[in-house]
Swiss-Prot record:
Subunit structure: Homotetramer.
Regulation of protein activity: Inhibited by NaCl, KCl, ATP, ADP, GTP and aspartate. Unlike E.coli, not regulated by acetyl-CoA.
Catalytic activity entry: oxaloacetate + phosphate = phosphoenolpyruvate + hydrogencarbonate
Example GO biological process: carbon fixation
Molecular function, one GO term: magnesium ion binding
The protein's name: Phosphoenolpyruvate carboxylase
Listed NCBIfam families: PEPCase_arch
Lineage: superkingdom: Archaea
Lineage: Archaea, Methanobacteriati, Methanobacteriota, Methanomada group, Methanobacteria
Assigned EC number: 4.1.1.31
Statement: the UniProt record of this protein carries the keyword Magnesium: yes
Coiled-coil portions: none
Co-factor(s): Mg(2+)
Temperature dependence: Optimum temperature is 62 degrees Celsius.
Organism: Methanothermobacter thermautotrophicus (strain ATCC 29096 / DSM 1053 / JCM 10044 / NBRC 100330 / Delta H)
Length: 483
């Protein structure tokens, strides 16, 4: 079965709401329309569906096939196009744990709906993504639960001797694939080991694996996140050779340089930069903050570009650099935590339901402080004229930078794309950070964005916040991403 190359996600990093949305914050029915739109008009071959939050719709398959019959008759869901469920991780997200079971129970129902629609056996959903994977046990529990309790219940006998299968019918598909999503430092360093343990003893010929790019940037800095992705991709290549199982890495990219720098106009650069990745995510900003023709062209390139081979990497040298850089990055974030949280209150939402929880609950903890989620965090810092990509940069020596450029050739491009939106006069941009990136880059600042951030800073200083959200959106519109 063909593995998708371009996964549309529901990450709310867009400035502009899509034309089909009833209001700026997308609700449940909007997300049904969105799934159809990305398949039929934009050309994505996969939609990730977050199975969490108050507006989650477990009847997404039925609604898609009912509302858009003509399209889905010609494009078989589960074969030509994928709908991939992102489930809660009960090990971390205790409050959402039982949603996992509800979601797994919905898979056979979707199978029945699709089989009736197509007049043949059809599995529209047969994979789930497990966030915050930290061990093979987390993956095996889901795989086993489906086999033993969802599929397995058909063998149970009721009081009158009738089996569940005879009474209700067969439960299909017979098994599901579990895609591990690695989101933190330890998870990425052990991603190949955990995946190998999960594969052990199973008759699996192909396995998808997923690397986060956004949350690691927030927790450890952009350079750390990129280097951790490189290590994991290299390790996956080695595991593939050792195990004989074909691996298909997915990488979660946003449009802000801090969160991946994937835009319709730089697909070739980013796919080459992340050689070894097979599937790339396109988040809301990619889809809705650019001309539709450019978006379609970008997605077509994503789907057609030849996957590269992950490069070798000097693991110990990389980890030494990450350690020093991350320490300085976190120190600088701590210095800004109060103003980040203050501005975050005015960053507009773009989805009605809460999305996945992530590493530290709905807010990010760093020591004894809480921070907003990655998109809001990024938007808040850009609004202050302090692109988060620049934080911690002063910790790197010229020797470090030479080494990093060999492993991460796009470093200069990503920093340049970010630094143009810095405000060199911002009181929140430290002198040591400013001098270090100006020496490295000689940036050309965006005058319009600088002027808007000055207005934001002035409004905060005099506590006149009535139009702060409007100014934050104005700056975001100039960048073509919210956060």
């Amino acid at each position: 079965m063909k593995v998708p190359r371009c996964m549309s996600t529901q990450h709310p990093d867009n400035v502009n709401p899509p034309f089909f949305a009833e209001e700026p914050e997308l609700g449940g029915e909007d997300e049904i329309r969105e799934a159809y739109y990305v398949f039929s008009h934009l050309g994505c071959d996969e939609q990730m569906w977050d199975c969490e939050g108050k507006e989650v719709d477990n009847y997404v398959v039925k609604k898609l096939l009912t509302k858009y019959q003509a399209f889905f008759r010609d494009h078989v869901l589960g074969e030509d196009l994928r709908l991939t469920l992102r489930v809660p991780n009960p090990t971390v997200e205790r409050a959402e744990a039982k949603i996992l079971l509800e979601t797994l129970e919905s898979i056979p129902r979707s199978y029945d709906t699709a089989s009736l629609f197509y007049g043949m056996d059809a599995a529209p959903v047969f994979e789930v993504i497990l966030p915050m994977t930290s061990s093979s046990s987390c993956l095996n529990r889901i795989h086993s639960y489906y086999l033993d309790f969802v599929k397995g219940k058909e063998r149970l006998q009721l009081a009158d001797g009738v089996t569940v299968k005879e009474w209700i019918g067969e439960f299909r598909p017979d098994e599901i694939n579990v895609i591990p999503l690695f989101e933190d430092h330890e998870g990425m360093l052990n991603a190949a080991k955990i995946t190998g343990e999960y594969l052990d003893g199973k008759d699996i010929q192909e396995q998808r694996v997923f690397l986060a790019r956004s949350d690691p940037a927030m927790n450890y800095g952009m350079i750390s996140a990129t280097l951790l992705n490189r290590i994991a991709l290299s390790d996956f290549r080695d595991l593939e050779e050792e195990s004989g199982v074909k691996l298909y890495p997915i990488i979660g990219m946003g449009s802000a340089p801090f969160r991946g720098n994937l835009r319709p106009d730089n697909v070739e650069d980013v796919t080459w930069e992340y050689r070894g990745a097979y599937t790339f995510t396109v988040q809301s900003s990619f889809k809705y903050d650019h001309e539709p023709s450019d978006v379609i062209r970008g997605i077509k390139k994503l789907r057609s570009v030849k996957p590269g081979r992950a490069a070798e990497i000097e693991r110990e040298s990389v980890l030494e650099i990450i350690s020093a850089y991350c320490r300085e990055y976190r120190r600088q974030v701590m210095d800004l935590v109060d103003i980040i949280n203050r501005v975050a209150r005015y960053v507009p939402g773009r989805r009605k339901r809460k999305l996945h929880i992530g590493l530290f609950g709905y807010s990010r903890s760093m020591g004894n402080v809480s921070l907003p989620r990655a998109i809001t965090f990024t938007a808040a810092l850009y609004s202050l004229g302090v692109p988060p990509e620049l934080l911690g940069f002063n910790a790197l020596s010229s020797g470090d930078l030479e080494f990093i450029e060999e492993v991460y050739p796009g470093l200069g491009r990503d920093l340049h794309d970010a630094a143009r939106y810095a405000n060199p006069e911002s009181p929140f941009l430290s002198p040591e950070v400013k001098s270090s990136f100006e020496e490295y880059l000689e940036p050309e600042y965006d005058e319009g964005h600088m002027k808007t951030t000055e207005e934001i800073i002035r409004a905060l200083r005099i506590n006149r916040t009535a139009n702060l959200q409007e100014l934050i959106l104005e700056a975001a519109s100039q960048r073509k991403f919210l956060g």
